[in-house]
Curated annotation (Swiss-Prot):
Source organism phylogeny: Bacteria, Pseudomonadati, Pseudomonadota, Gammaproteobacteria, Pasteurellales
Record field: transmembrane: none
GO cellular component: bacterial nucleoid
Protein's UniProt name: DNA repair protein RecO
Matching NCBIfam families: reco
Gene this protein is translated from: recO
Domain of life from the UniProt record: Bacteria
One GO-annotated biological process of the protein: DNA recombination
Length: 240
């Protein structure tokens, strides 16, 4: 079958695993093609330079070929030095990568999400206090990209504008409805307005945003637990 040679694309390694004795299967997130899997021939060989280049969080320039679902990597160059993710930021980066592996359709371009991903990694690498806001912002952008439409500014029951001092309960496929019930699905109006504006400036809003994104992402992730979350839990236990 005739091969198709792609142009250079910017991208990142999301995940990689051994394939045969000398090669790697590499899952990529690229600016134009989105998520795809490539075969990096000889990348595990002792003298291969690819082993050090094909690492998560390193901005790359990539080319590949092939018409089948599994492409063959033909060229790769580092576009910049690796983003310095360490400790909590590193595990957060693994979490973001796993999200993309789990929820994105293969070979579907998400150019705006690619920019959101780059901004998220930059935030994770910048300072510890930016980790949670960067994660929450990316999760909301990811949900929007997936077509998850929810109105944070209006009560789904009455259509009235959300009151920042009232509480609203989330109902899947409907939205937020004014309610006196307080449970895991209940949010203050001021939190909903902050979600809409992507403003995560205080700990209460960050916690509420994290609670909401876990609820919203569940329909895409299913019941299979995230490995990155389990690894982070183990890391935190070790730190104690």
């Amino acid at each position: 079958m005739r091969q198709v040679i792609e142009n250079w694309q910017r991208g990142f390694v999301l995940h990689r695993k051994a394939y045969s004795e000398t090669s790697l299967l590499v899952e990529l997130f690229t600016e134009e093609t989105g998520r795809l899997t490539v075969l990096a021939k000889g990348a595990r060989a002792k003298r291969s330079a690819l082993k050090g280049i094909l690492q998560p969080f390193t901005p790359l320039l990539l080319r590949w070929s092939g018409r089948s679902e599994l492409k063959t990597l033909t060229k790769v160059e580092p576009a910049a030095i690796a983003l310095p993710l360490q400790q909590t930021a590193l595990y957060s980066g693994f979490y973001v990568n796993e999200l993309l592996c789990r929820v994105l359709e293969p070979e579907t371009g998400y150019p705006h999400l690619f920019q959101d991903y780059l901004r998220c990694l930059t935030g994770l690498a910048s300072a510890e206090h930016l980790i949670e806001p960067s994660l929450r912002h990316f999760e909301f952008q990811l949900l929007q990209t997936l077509g998850y439409g929810v109105d944070f500014c209006h009560c789904a029951g009455s259509g009235e504008l959300v009151d920042e001092n009232m509480t609203y309960r989330y109902r899947e496929e409907k939205g937020f409805i004014a309610s006196l019930i307080k449970d895991n699905l209940t949010f203050y109006g001021r939190e909903l307005l902050a979600f809409d504006a992507r403003q995560f400036h205080d700990s209460a809003t960050l916690q509420a945003a994290k609670r909401f994104t876990r609820i919203a992402l569940k329909q895409y992730l299913g019941n299979k637990p995230l490995k990155s979350r389990e690894l982070f839990t183990q890391y935190m236990l070790y730190q104690k």
